[in-house]
């Protein structure tokens, strides 16, 4: 009889292991969320971190005693470029990240934030919380050469609307929105094609990877006006908004245009906001657990306090009645 009892006990334990630890009161084996973030020089990260909050006055990036404190979990993968974030999230079923709305494609799933899907309409009406300007920067201390000044005028003109529309960002025509809050409004300029290509050699473009689609469209559009290709007129190296700011500050030849995907207000830099963009929260396309996240849930995930998607899965109330 004792042998029979032992045999039955072994069978029961084997069955428990086969159907998973959850059924026996243990862990289901669900994998941890893979947090994918941008590096600290990214304007996209700055825009995301300064909005995502725990609801009690804490943000992923904030000033504490005059110092900037970053609260993204140390377990996060920190990547330099938008494309790298997209590739990692597309490969990893447990990943979550954030990218420019204009960069979203069908390899990723976009999650609503506070119940709102990012779009041109929800950015303009302010209902989508995580948004930022696309900023064009030049040196305020070094005069621009002829061709760089001409391209800047082109960027400030109505021509930029075509390129913004094509790249998925929201063109700004309102002079007040084109300037920093409280500063002199920046009007839309009129661009006239010159009789010949302005002098000055190649223009250097540095800065935000999120603005790549927009600036490449603008470069190509400008070059065509003078029968040239973009490669003939521009040198482009996009490594993040902070790199763009540094390049503009260090411009000694008047040939640098910087790009930032977060608001800019710094000494030594002239800037204007050419467009608005949403920062979209993305997960793997196969993720059926999460469709919506609140800012507070995002804070929990990106600080590492929430480690499983099941913790933020939307609960549906059962209609079964207890008899």
Cite the ranges covered by each PLM segment.
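Generic detector of N-terminal low-structure segments
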Residues: 7-9, 311
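Positively charged n-region of N-terminal signal peptides that target proteins for export
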Residues: 1-7
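Bacterial N-terminal signal peptides
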Residues: 9-18
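C-terminal motif of bacterial Sec signal peptides marking the signal peptidase cleavage site
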Residues: 19-23
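Exported/periplasmic ABC-transporter solute-binding proteins
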Residues: 25-323
């Amino acid at each position: 009889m004792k042998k029979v009892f032992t045999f039955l006990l072994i069978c029961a334990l084997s069955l428990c292991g086969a159907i998973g630890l959850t059924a026996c009161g243990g862990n289901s084996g669900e994998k941890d969320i893979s947090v994918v973030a941008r590096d600290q020089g990214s304007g996209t990260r700055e825009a995301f971190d300064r909005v995502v909050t725990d609801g009690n006055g804490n943000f992923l990036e904030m000033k504490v005693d005059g110092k900037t404190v970053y609260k993204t979990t140390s377990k996060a993968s920190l990547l330099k470029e938008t494309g790298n974030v997209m590739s990692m999230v597309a490969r990893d079923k447990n990943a979550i990240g954030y990218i420019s709305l204009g960069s979203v494609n069908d390899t990723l799933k976009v999650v609503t934030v506070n119940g709102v899907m990012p779009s041109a309409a929800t950015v303009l009406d302010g209902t989508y919380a995580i948004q930022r300007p696309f900023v064009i920067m030049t040196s305020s201390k070094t005069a621009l050469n002829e061709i760089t000044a001409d391209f800047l005028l082109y960027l400030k003109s109505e021509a930029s609307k075509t390129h913004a529309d094509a790249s998925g960002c929201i063109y700004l025509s309102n002079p007040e929105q084109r300037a920093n809050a409280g500063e002199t409004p920046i009007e839309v300029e009129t661009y006239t094609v010159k009789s010949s290509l302005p002098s000055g050699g190649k223009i250097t473009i540095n800065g935000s990877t999120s603005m790549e689609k927009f600036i490449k469209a603008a470069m190509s559009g400008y070059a065509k006006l003078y029968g040239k290709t973009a490669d003939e007129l521009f040198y482009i190296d996009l490594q993040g908004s902070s790199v763009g700011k540094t390049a503009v500050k260090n411009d000694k030849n008047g040939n640098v245009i910087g790009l930032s995907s977060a608001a800019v207000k710094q000494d030594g830099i002239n800037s204007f906001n050419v467009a608005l963009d949403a920062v979209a929260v993305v997960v793997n396309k196969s993720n059926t657990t999460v469709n919506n996240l609140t800012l507070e849930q995002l804070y929990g995930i990106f600080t590492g306090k929430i480690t499983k998607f099941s913790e933020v899965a939307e609960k549906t109330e059962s209609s079964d009645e207890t008899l």
